[in-house]
Design a protein with these regions (language model features):
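Glycan-recognition and catalytic cores of secretory/periplasmic carbohydrate-active enzymes
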Residues: 1-222
Length: 222
């Protein structure tokens, strides 16, 4: 958002802040394998990075699914706004982790390190909003990457996730009394808030991803 405003207003100070923020986030929260930490703790006086942390993930060293989806989507968007290849590479790294750690139905559990032998919400709890965010990001990334084989993999995975999300397991179309579009979203597992419910960001990015997929299909049919 900061970079978008910088582009619209030609405010170079805002652009500098946006780029610095993304670089700091990459350096402190994106791990070598492409996974992400939820939060970073900094010394408020010196600004020194202290450690990775989390409030909504399983552990500080785990991979909170929605956090990884935000990173994948966000760095793809930052590349689109700046044309800085360094941000494209971050999104690609996030995508590789995502693609290699999805379960069979392509919709992630709330944390990639969750113990699936345990029942929800701490264990095998799906997170549909993370899938929606990542699907939208992967569709963008497929058009940005310079690697044709990866473009196909990103696009195919995004479509597979959307295919899963429109099944009765996730789409609330035929669920009486359900006040939302997607089931099995998660806000905050540790606090028991918005667990296995519809969440507004899940709805937004689900519709966004569907529109991108439809528009892509229309372009290919021309």
């Amino acid at each position: 958002l900061i970079q978008y405003v910088a582009n619209q207003t030609l405010d170079q100070d805002l652009a500098r802040i946006a780029v610095a923020h993304c670089r700091t986030t990459r350096d402190c929260l994106v791990r070598p394998d492409g996974s992400t930490a939820h939060e970073g703790i900094f010394d408020t006086q010196s600004g020194q990075f202290l450690r990775q942390s989390t409030h909504q993930g399983l552990r500080a060293d785990s991979v909170w699914a929605r956090g990884l989806a935000w990173s994948l989507y966000g760095y793809s968007k930052m590349y689109a706004l700046t044309d800085a290849v360094e941000f494209l590479h971050v999104s690609e790294r996030n995508a590789e982790y995502w693609l290699h750690h999805l379960p069979a139905d392509r919709v992630p559990y709330w944390d990639f390190h969750a113990d699936l032998a345990l029942p929800p919400p701490q264990g095998a709890q799906k997170e549909s909003s993370a899938a929606a965010i990542a699907a939208s990001g992967l569709l963008d990334l497929a058009g940005q990457t310079r690697l044709p084989d990866r473009a196909a993999a990103y696009r195919d995975t995004a479509i597979a996730m959307l295919d899963a999300l429109v099944t009765p397991e996730y789409l609330a179309l035929d669920t009486p009394g359900w006040e939302g579009i997607l089931k099995h979203g998660v806000y905050h597992t540790a606090k028991g808030l918005g667990v296995d419910e519809s969440v507004m960001w899940g709805e937004f990015f689900f519709v966004e991803a569907l529109l991108k997929a439809v528009q892509q299909e229309e372009r290919e049919g021309e």
